[in-house]
Design a protein with these regions (language model features):
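Pyridoxal 5′-phosphate
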Residues: 10, 55-59, 65-66, 77-78, ...
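Conserved beta-loop-alpha segment that forms the PLP phosphate-binding cup at the N-terminus of a helix
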Residues: 1-23, 40-43
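Non-catalytic terminal extensions of PLP-dependent enzymes
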Residues: 209-213, 217-224, 228-230, 236-313
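Active-site nucleophile and cofactor-binding loops and adjacent substrate-binding regions
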Residues: 1-7, 32-34, 236, 269
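Active-site C-terminal subdomain of aminotransferase-like
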Residues: 122-239, 245-249, 313
Length: 313
């Protein structure tokens, strides 16, 4: 399965939990920052749940604005650790307090960060809390096929209690063969991805993951410093493996096009317009070359922006 499946199953569990424990029916909604993954919209479409995307503040979840959007039909709050567009960890501790205050399910989407953040923290980086150490967090999704380095698709979803997890299960009957119970929507799932995920976790172990994630952070730090030295502005203060940056004078999408000409096939943000990198351990080896090409791309755009007065008086 992928991160979408983990998120969909967390939403399904939260919905059924809200029905059973709080009597919520019909017209349900989820309150989330605008930076959350579209998988929540998929879940909302499938289950007829409104997803209210609240504008972010300084690229992070705006907890006060999210609280203002809550009503009697709200079943879930969402935060990311980190969000995919900006690579920033939302203020999960504040969201946890809000979830407790309003008696709501809080899901943390750590599909990107779930298997890098713990090892980055072990390596001495002071990361914000986002896991079950935060009171109020009900469920967490994390992808092994991202920074767990497993084959696609291998995602996981965790619940604070067994009771909460049980609401994820599909339990159907009556049927001529009796009850049919599956942990997810899929009746049949391939075992190859599970075996591959087990193999890579056994092969790397804690020490292996710490070293891999150290290289990721080193690549991000090198690129962040280089970006700033070249006049780019990094969006927020990323601490993991994703970084987004813009330029105050030049269109980042034009720079992105120039980088593609030089063989860099990365990503870009549309709102705000920015360059976007999701870094791996190998990128630490090519960070200097990337910055050199970024500088060339910026210079090319700058020269094209200067009007020519040749042949004029």
């Amino acid at each position: 399965s992928g991160g979408t499946d983990s998120i969909v199953m967390a939403v399904k569990a939260a919905r059924d939990y809200a029905r059973a424990k709080h009597g919520l029916t019909g017209g349900l909604n989820i309150i989330a920052p605008s930076s959350v993954h579209p998988a929540f919209d998929k879940a909302g479409m499938m289950m007829d749940i409104e997803v209210r995307r609240i504008p972010v503040k300084d690229y992070l979840a705006d907890v006060e604005a999210m609280e203002a959007a809550i009503d009697e039909h709200t079943l879930m709050l969402v935060g990311s650790a980190p969000c995919f567009p900006f690579g920033l960890i939302d203020p999960i501790e504040k969201l946890g307090k809000l979830a407790q205050k309003r008696v709501l399910w809080l899901h943390v989407d750590a599909c990107v960060g779930g298997y890098i953040a713990p090892f980055v923290r072990m390596n001495g980086v002071d990361l914000p809390k986002f896991d079950f150490s935060v009171p109020g967090v009900s469920s967490i999704s994390g992808d092994l096929h991202k920074y767990g380095y497993a084959s696609k698709g291998a995602s996981t979803v965790f619940f604070r209690t067994k009771e909460m997890r049980d609401f994820m299960h599909f339990d159907a009957g009556p049927w001529p063969l009796g009850r049919m119970v599956t942990p997810t929507l899929a009746g049949t799932r391939p075992g190859g991805a599970i075996a591959a995920a087990w193999a890579i976790t056994q092969y790397l172990g804690v020490d292996g993951y710490r070293e891999k994630q150290r290289e990721v952070v080193a690549a991000r730090e090198t690129i962040a410093k280089g970006d700033r030295d070249l006049g780019f502005q990094v969006l927020g203060e990323p601490q993991l493996g994703i970084i987004a940056f813009t330029h105050p004078e030049h269109d980042p999408l034009r720079i992105y096009t120039e980088l593609m000409k030089r063989g860099w096939f990365t990503a870009a943000l549309i709102e705000p317009r920015a360059l976007h990198l999701m870094l791996s351990p190998k990128h630490n080896e090519v960070a200097a070359q990337y910055l050199a090409d970024l500088n060339e791309a910026r210079a090319t755009i700058r020269e094209e922006s200067i009007p020519s007065y040749a042949g004029t008086i």
